[in-house]
């Protein structure tokens, strides 16, 4: 119901969406059984008065609180693996990146890392967050591997919005070592101070992040896959470079 005044049973989720019609700014709420999520990614309800309303059923908006230590430098954000493994830590920073960009809807992003510990887990999280934030396509390195120069090449060659690189450079890896994440802009180069400051500013006030509830992508298989409405291309890590 539009007023959101519904009685919620334990197996019911509430979904909210804005009408797509330019003439209508109403927000709509709908209750959908969890069992329906397994069958559909989206459904539309035709309404002659207000147009078509699309509900993305498996996008979660997770409440969070800021961390005080997420100020990136030109080499991105580098911390101990155990810091990144804290609940919401990586997600907060990734959402801060997305919120700082000039529109993610319909954009393409490059993604990969140097293969250190936590690389694969982080990539799966970022893929699902990218899908939830409206990216249309992600080019991710085979097995999650993509060096900084190779990522820069992918960004320029395919004119992506930018790229996320998971690397802590010469810092040691392994569970007791370090992990890192940085954003490169559309020219393939590191994010300038204006961008990193915007990311940091957002990280200090963030209160929620979006993530798709979905199975992991098979990073070991080259090819094209769907993750919600987003296309994931698992590409050869060095061919274009």
Summary of predicted features, one role per range:
Residues 2-4, 19-33, 53:
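Intrinsically disordered, low-complexity, charge-rich segments with an acidic bias
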Residues 2-13:
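Extreme N-terminal basic, low-complexity initiation segments
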Residues 42-45, 52-53:
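Short, positively charged and aromatic/hydrophobic N-terminal segments
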Residues 55-129, 229-241:
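An N-terminal, well-structured beta->alpha segment
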Residues 58-67, 80, 88, 177-241:
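Gly/Ser/Thr-enriched, mixed-charge loops and adjacent short helices
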Residues 82, 95, 99-103, 135-136, ...:
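Generic secondary-structure signature for well-ordered alpha-helical cores
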Residues 98, 104-190:
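Ferredoxin-reductase
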